[in-house]
Amino acid sequence: MSSGIILLIVAIVLLVIIAYLIGVIIRKRNDSMIGTLEDRKQHLFGLPVNEEIEEVKELHLIGQSQTSFREWNQKWVDLTLNSFADIENHLFEAEKYNDTFNFIRAKHEINNVESQLNLVEEDITSIREALSILKEQEEKNSARVTHALDLYEKLQSSVAENDSHFGTTKPEIEKQMKNIETEFSQFVTLNSSGDPVEASEVLDRAEEHTIALGQITEQIPAIVAKLEDEFPDQLDDLESGYRRLLEDNYHFAENNIEEKFQEIREAIRSNASELVSLDLDRAREENSHIQERIDNMYALFEHEIKAFKVSAKHSKIIPSYLEHAKSNNDKLKEEMTRLSRKYILNENQASTVQGFEKEIEDVEKNVLELAKDFKGQEIPYSELQVVFEKNLKTLSAVESGQMEVFESIKNIENIEEDARKEADLYVTQLHMIKRFMEKRHLPGIPQDYLNVFFTTSTQLEALMDELSKGKINIEAVSRLRDVASASIANLEDYTYQVVENATLTEQLLQYSNRYRSFEAGVQNSFEIAMHLFEVEYDYQASFDEISYALETVEPGVTDRFVSSYERTREHIRF
């Protein structure tokens, strides 16, 4: 056998071996893929779709929800009966073809199974999502219905508990309750007949009406309590109080109080009747108006009761206060009469006291009898209070005025006595000032000083003349005393100034002798100053002249002399 044939045989054997090996590899790979698809199929088939379907089925769906559930349930049945069986057949075919090394057909079957599994997986996902939505939707609807029913049950319970607190609104509330019950029945009917949209709308309305009626029933008892309990009780209290006040001789400016009571009762009845419409805002507003009218009646009675207490107090004060004012005025008149014998009094004071007397008489005429027979008057105590307070203010003003007049006249005699003492003192001081000037032995007295001296003397004489009159004008005395006091003080200061200027000038003139022989300016000022000093008696001008000249040649000399003088200056000994 030739070598070529041997090589060919070897090559063929090798090809067969290689082909077999490749076939084995492909077969193993296909086995692996078929196994994976089998696992996937088992996984999909093992999903808890049946359990989820049973859960939704137990919800007892109705209407559109039930129809939708049936469609998805049927789809799952189709998948389990048809799709999974078909997939199982194709897997079997794929295994058979793979085992017989028919890899092309095996591959075709594998691809077919994979596509079917993808579709089944998508369908199962859709079914589960739909079931979840149906379950969630039904749970929401159930919770919503439960919530609405709970609200209604609470409303029923609340209405039953407060049955006696609704007054005239009870029939209307019962009517509204029946309407809500009808709406719930309508909801059940529509929901069962497969009209979920309209059923939902009806449920919404039923819930809204339940909430609204619940809010109304919560507010009604407070309104009814006012109309049936509080207002009638307050009105009964007012009427009984009014009768007691009339028995106690109270009077009122208003003459229609009984009519007002009737009007308030009618307003209460009217508001209670109209409350049946459940217009709570209007009812509350009307209640506020009724309460305001009742409060006004209370305020009226309380005002009169308070006025009675105040007037009773005033009625006790007025007689004694009036006597006090009369006594004060009599004493004031007596004192003014006594003082008028010796003094000229202010005419305004006399007329003021007469005015007090007139006011006291008016009070006595207008009020005294009212105060004494306080409880026997047929006018409201509030009006009596106004009258009493007005006249008490008058008496208070009279008393204040009396005190002012008394203060103005009580010290007249003391003023006179003090004025006489001061006048004597001023005369003595005038003589002492004159003696003080004489002892200075001045060349002469300045005319200005003489004018001040004689003016002061004249003012003292005027004061003495006024004090010596038969009837003393005390106002004039006070004025002249003040003038005399100021004049004496001014004369004393002027005296010290004249003496100081004269003394210092004389000392400086003597001191200037040091410079006269060689300072022409000092000599000239010396001559001028001597003329002013000895001839014109102008000591101030003389001092200014010589001090200025000396300051030019010896600065500070004037201050030295002034300081020395002030330390040793002699004072007038009064």
Swiss-Prot record:
Which ranges does the record list as Extracellular topological domains? Answer: 1-7
Glycosyltransferase among the record's keywords?
A: no
Question: What single Pfam family name could you report for this chain, choosing any that match?
Answer: EzrA
Any single Gene Ontology cellular-component annotation: plasma membrane
Supply the InterPro entries for this chain: EzrA
List the coiled-coil residues: 102-140, 243-379, 459-520
Domain of life, per UniProt, equals: Bacteria
Keywords, sorted A to Z = Cell cycle, Cell division, Cell membrane, Coiled coil, Membrane, Septation, Transmembrane, Transmembrane helix
Q: Report the sequence similarity comment from the record.
A: Belongs to the EzrA family.
Tell me the protein's name.
Answer: Septation ring formation regulator EzrA
